[in-house]
Amino acid sequence: KEDPWERLRKLKAGLPNTRLQMLLRGQNLLGYRHYSDDVVRAFVAKAAVNGIDVFRIFDAMNDVRNLRVSIEAVKAAGKHAQGTIAYTTSPVHTVEAFVKQAKAMQAMGIDSIAIKDMAGLLTPYATADLVRALKAEVDLPVFIHSHDTAGMGSMCQLKAIEAGADHIDTAISSFAWG
């Protein structure tokens, strides 16, 4: 039976100069149900000790209340807490709402912000507008992670760079399309 902590330690040993990152679903950790605060704190501490450096923390409903304990735990472990906006579209999911969310996460002590376009819904100009607004309103590095579901991922990345994004996520094509 595989031990994920052992695998993580081996990765860290083999990549000593690479910051390892994980996606953390806030109060849901790695799944789809809420866990108690003590379980969240213990999991984050264990992940940090075993080699995770950057925790990309999000809530699928963009409810920042579900991020607080994870952010506190990451900071207590001395690691990088990346607050994450789960991008989607609706009448209430506006640039202004996402900026408000980013400011709330900044007040919680995050180190950077990620725009997580998990469904590939971002369009190039929406990307530029959102990145520009975040850079103007929040004094933190902005990362973008997009999926190419609608074939616009690379253009969104370009527009993010042009609008001032600090980092973009990329993938090796032989792995990304497989």
Label the predicted regions.
Residues 1-106, 110-112, 120-124:
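Active-site beta->alpha loop and helix N-cap motifs at the rims of alpha/beta catalytic domains
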Residues 118-178:
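Catalytic alpha/beta core domains of metabolic enzymes, predominantly
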